[in-house]
Amino acid sequence: STDPVEDSQEKAVSDWDLLVDTNLKGVFLTGRAAIPYLVNSGGGFILNIATDHICPPPGFATGGGTRMDIYDASKWGINGLTQSWSKRLNADNVRVNAFCMDATDSAMIRYASQKFNRDMSDDIVDSWMKPHQLADLMLELYNEGPDGRTGENIGIWLNHPISLPPQQKILPSRHP
């Protein structure tokens, strides 16, 4: 992302296009392609991937670092899609949730950590969540079935149990 004080407008717009197209537009287009199929099939399940920046561990504020403005905006957009779609699609038996994950061992985080000269010591890398842990949690969420939770941003954080929280009650929207 960009530094709103130091980076040029050109860099900011270029970074915006890249991150919003990847993080938000990708989720939007994939969801819009899948939703008609899910509705016509009698229901289904959408799991969006957001970030712990919008659903932080207890005791922490939302948002990433000082240079995370565009990344955070794109992930907040995913929150908006998750919330709106879950309300609209609930009557069609389509559940929509998001995982708001902390650092997960992946090619992306390894690349970013190296690019930005972040600590890659064994202790740090070992602390990252493993993909199989998230896959297990994903299956648990899916297996809740048609009556399972919808519209939830589920925080999954380092140094916390990797588990589903209690299901939240769906609140009515102020807007139709």
List the model feature ranges, each with a label:
Residues 2, 33-42, 56:
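A short helix-coil junction within the Rossmann-fold of NAD(P)-dependent oxidoreductases
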Residues 31-32, 83:
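A short, exposed helix-loop element centered on a Lys and neighboring polar residues
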Residues 2-5, 60-63, 91, 101-128, ...:
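A glycine/serine/threonine-rich, flexible loop-to-helix segment
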Residues 79, 89-105, 148-154:
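Conserved Rossmann-fold SDR core element
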Residues 7-15, 45-77, 82-83, 87-91, ...:
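Catalytic loop of short-chain dehydrogenase/reductase
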Residues 98, 118-172:
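C-terminal helical subdomain
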